[in-house]
Amino acid sequence: MKDQGSSGVSPAPGEGEKKAINSELWHACAGPLVSLPPVGSLVVYFPQGHSEQVAASMHKELDNIPGYPSLPSKLICKLLSLTLHADSETDEVYVQMTLQPVNKYDRDAMLASELGLKQNKQPAEFFCKTLTASDTSTHGGFSVPRRAAEKIFPPLDFTMQPPAQELIAKDLHDISWKFRHIYRGQPKRHLLTTGWSVFVSTKRLLAGDSVLFIRDEKSQLLLGIRRATRPQPALSSSVLSSDSMHIGILAAAAHAAANSSPFTIFYNPRASPSEFVIPLAKYNKALYTQVSLGMRFRMLFETEDSGVRRYMGTITGIGDLDPVRWKNSHWRNLQVGWDESTASERRTRVSIWEIEPVATPFYICPPPFFRPKLPKQPGMPDDENEVESAFKRAMPWLADDFALKDVQSALFPGLSLVQWMAMQQNPQMLTAASQTVQSPYLNSNALAMQDVMGSSNEDPTKRLNTQAQNMVLPNLQVGSKVDHPVMSQHQQQPHQLSQQQQVQPSQQSSVVLQQHQAQLLQQNAIHLQQQQEHLQRQQSQPAQQLKAASSLHSVEQHKLKEQTSGGQVASQAQMLNQIFPPSSSQLQQLGLPKSPTHRQGLTGLPIAGSLQQPTLTQTSQVQQAAEYQQALLQSQQQQQQLQLQQLSQPEVQLQLLQKIQQQNMLSQLNPQHQSQLIQQLSQKSQEILQQQILQHQFGGSDSIGQLKQSPSQQAPLNHMTGSLTPQQLVRSHSALAESGDPSSSTAPSTSRISPINSLSRANQGSRNLTDMVATPQIDNLLQEIQSKPDNRIKNDIQSKETVPIHNRHPVSDQLDASSATSFCLDESPREGFSFPPVCLDNNVQVDPRDNFLIAENVDALMPDALLSRGMASGKGMCTLTSGQRDHRDVENELSSAAFSSQSFGVPDMSFKPGCSSDVAVTDAGMPSQGLWNNQTQRMRTFTKVQKRGSVGRSIDITRYRDYDELRHDLACMFGIQGQLEDPYRMDWKLVYVDHENDILLVGDDPWEEFVGCVKSIKILSAAEVQQMSLDGDLGGVPPQTQACSASDDANAWRG
């Protein structure tokens, strides 16, 4: 070997008797995957890999490599010296290393090992070419690729004919070689002619060998060669046996390990299958990688042009390569399989530090009823990982938490995820559960279905008010429960009971809450039937009789006040009269006069003092009235059954799903709200108990039932029934019936307001809410509502101007004192708006297994998103100011807005397109045109188009038929005619942002899917496209949403 020298990695090559080998040229000849550790760093030496190098050089099988018993499978050493070598005859590169085993190592050596991983010793400018037969012929020359010649060689003088120049390059041994570089031929090409034949003959190059030209850091032109691997004859055993070489190498390493003495090894990167001296930092990093069977990985391999390529593979086994001689060794402990069939030549066992594990996402195979991927839905935020996004896309009811807790399902409340999946596997369990869920809600949702299906002519924002009060008003019904208890009698006991129940766990609270909820829903349905029948009866009575009865009743009331003493029975009777005022017909039967102040209720009954016992005639009249009420109840039940039969099964299922989802949203309250609900229930139970005590004091339930079920409870409604539409009446009763859910509010029962008085106030216009409730309580409620600035709700004072009666809402004047939601709906700015039907088909289907409703988009039925639309300023209501339009446009705009419901006291729920709970449908099943057909203003369906340097434009994407029309129109708008239509022009790129905020190229998707998914369009220049490819975004320009759509945090709805 000649021209041998040594040079450290850090210092520059030293000058001495012999020239040092250029490090960049050495690494270029060694290969792109070779990286030597720096001197002074810590390395891991594997004797097993060293033996493989010897076996490869001797052309011997690996199974015949002998072992050494006292030598461990690896040694942690310190690299003392490193010398680069090149064979003088073959130019084969190798390195000599001096290692010293260490038991302890300092921090500096560890840092040097880590820094060695970041050093790149490969040359920046080089090219490598495998020689062909013509390149190695004596009469020809070396053909150089054009780009390589222009990059590496000095520029030619093209004024000469032909252009030519002389090149001087040095090899590994610092020998200079001269070549003539000429540009000639047809077609013209770069050739090395003079001097090339001498170089090929001197180096004994053959076809298949490779030649490298590089420019080092000093811009010197260097030349190197790589010889192809060819079978060589094995050395004669008389010269040197392979076993003796193996034993000598292993013995030297074992001696050094026992005595901590230095030993020398030689590493040939072109002959050795793998590196057997690994930086300690690289080894430690690989050990932290958790590998498992089936894991995907990448591995780098060298290409013919001295480049690198990654091949994909799968781990098929983990274990020792040679468990007998090298036990518990990490050398090639992974058995792998390669994806490509051309990779069959590659070895089937690799080491853990040679691979790059691929963290594949966790895919879920959803059941068939889950929604499909297209059309694309707005997803979860960009900062979520792929596992959470997969869960939320496949299982929409999981919301933001998919832990193993009892998640409230949107289809079956109270079922956990495991139970729901088990029911899907067992159709019998699913059928039984569906029947169990349907039964307690059918009665309470009968009129609610009319509210959705039959009231298509009313303003959708009024329906929002009704639904919101249904969710939050606690047990607000006519004549069903005691709405205003006597606080002097019942304050202490509910307070003690609430203290005891607050200590109970949250699980017991939820169970009690569900039980009371089911009971009160059934009771509300019964009372609703009674009140409807009373309302129909009262419509036939003239208004004059009501006035006369009210005046006579007022006179009798004044007389009863003077006769009644202040005892407990009198106070209870006064409470009952305030809650259940008797009708005018009952006053006539009892012989009592009437007065105009009938609506204020009696303050006393002839049951205290001298009037404690009713007369026989009055008792018989009371019994007759009770029988009459029982007959009315039976007829109303029959009428309701006929109404349920007339309703179609899809309508029943749609309304049932909406009600269950509302209850599911309210059941996700935090424990503090649940404790408040328990306190509410305790107060309600005390009220029921006091009512039962009053029934015993009256001597039976007949008289109480007569007073309770009196038709006069609907007397204040008579002035409104003449002008209200039937749909509005049904809606008001639906609000009263559904408001009995105890889980919908945490307000104390004393703050509830009777719906009769609210309806009366809507008609009178001069009465205040303080007529029935103490003024300090109302002041506290208003302070609580106004003290929450985060609700994003506009607290407006209702206008005192005269409003047409068809625009009034019966229950709009009630104040909600719920601490779970704490908002006051403002309906006055939105009275004239109508909402178009959304997704009336292909979104709700019936499961054929049990005829239970299964929806493709469960989240879309939640009214929370539509409530959010009504909460901000009037500027955000532009999406509600039109009649009907194409369903695809409505879906585009709805899905572009992700509403946050934190201000409503429930977890975040994103509003997704697909189906809306506020669809206006007529009895025939067709979309309704709305009540105000004279409004011609349409919703904005336009999509924003932006181009940097130009004013943004808006286009109606639905009026185009294909991509060609869209490109042509956009090019004309922005003055770039002919540059968008030509696919070969690179000046401008047309991209769009979909609902997942992904930036895609216009034209890849089918036109129909593009129209349904486009959110905004941008025209990017070539520089912007390049910047986007580097940064992964639009160069700092945030993607614009659709016109008049809400942003992710609903700030766009603010004025």
Curated annotation (Swiss-Prot):
Domain (PB1) ranges: 940-1024
Subcellular location: Nucleus
Subunit structure: Homodimers and heterodimers.
Biased segments, Low complexity type: 488-510, 532-552, 742-756
Polar residues composition bias: residue spans: 757-769
Gene Ontology annotations of biological process type: auxin-activated signaling pathway; regulation of DNA-templated transcription
Domain remarks in the Swiss-Prot or TrEMBL record: Interactions between auxin response factors (ARFs) and Aux/IAA proteins occur through their C-terminal dimerization domains III and IV.
Protein name (record): Auxin response factor 16
SMART domains: B3
Database matches in Gene3D superfamilies: 2.30.30.1040, DNA-binding pseudobarrel domain, Phosphatidylinositol 3-kinase Catalytic Subunit, Chain A, domain 1
Organism listed in the record: Oryza sativa subsp. indica (Rice)
Any single Pfam family the record assigns to this protein: AUX_IAA
Principal cellular location given in the protein's record: nucleus
GO CC annotations, alphabetized: nucleus
